Amino acid sequence: MQQLQNIIETAFERRAEITPANADTVTREAVNQVISLLDSGALRVAEKIDGQWVTHQWLKKAVLLSFRINDNQVIEGAESRYFDKVPMKFADYDEARFQKEGFRVVPPAAVRQGAFIARNTVLMPSYVNIGAYVDEGTMVDTWATVGSCAQIGKNVHLSGGVGIGGVLEPLQANPTIIEDNCFIGARSEVVEGVIVEEGSVISMGVYIGQSTRIYDRETGEIHYGRVPAGSVVVSGNLPSKDGKYSLYCAVIVKKVDAKTRGKVGINELLRTID
């Protein structure tokens, strides 16, 4: 694996010179191998090690290099044709392969090659970009988008129209992460490497980036870039110091543990916020 990483790192330093016409065999094979490993879930761009999320930047570099070494090609669709550098994940799947993988894909859901989809996942008409990781038992609902290299945990529900941001550029940015057992409400956006920790519930229409204030009304604490585990979050506003205006924020209205979450429905958690 170290040899593979070294090839990617070296090639990335001269990426501006690489084209589909001049890409050498060693680089091309290394990049294709990484994309295949990401596609199968054997590698992932970010993983939790000793309780902390670690981003493997070299894997993101491999994804970026794939755009340098591959030319656009015609991609066949059910009702149309497309023209892109990245093939679709399910292009060569037959019924036996779908049965083996154990997930459902509802047309016209689109998943790019290099994204991993785990067993018991349901993809409604949605989009999953290259480098993303979608873990077991997750629902990606209609018109939801999972951005490049985003990490989605087990038993997550991404409601209709949800946007989970991708972070191939800038390269040093960490991927957006939704941990296990989270619910993200319809039309919400989580971007810029924000981490939504385990068991959190995000109401519909909540927008969270790195600069968004995440206000805990019980403690008065303000978080940036991280929704603490077990948070129930709605959209809100905080007043300016002079009281002349207010600015958007996300508000943690309560905290719930797994036991409470198991007994009480998501809608009930969001309705009883006073």
From Swiss-Prot:
GO terms for cellular component: cytoplasm. The gene is dapD. Its EC number is 2.3.1.117. NCBIfam families: dapD (TIGR00965), PRK11830.1 (NF008808). It is found in: Cytoplasm. It holds the Pfam family THDPS_N_2. This is 2,3,4,5-tetrahydropyridine-2,6-dicarboxylate N-succinyltransferase. Coiled coil: none annotated. PROSITE patterns: HEXAPEP_TRANSFERASES.
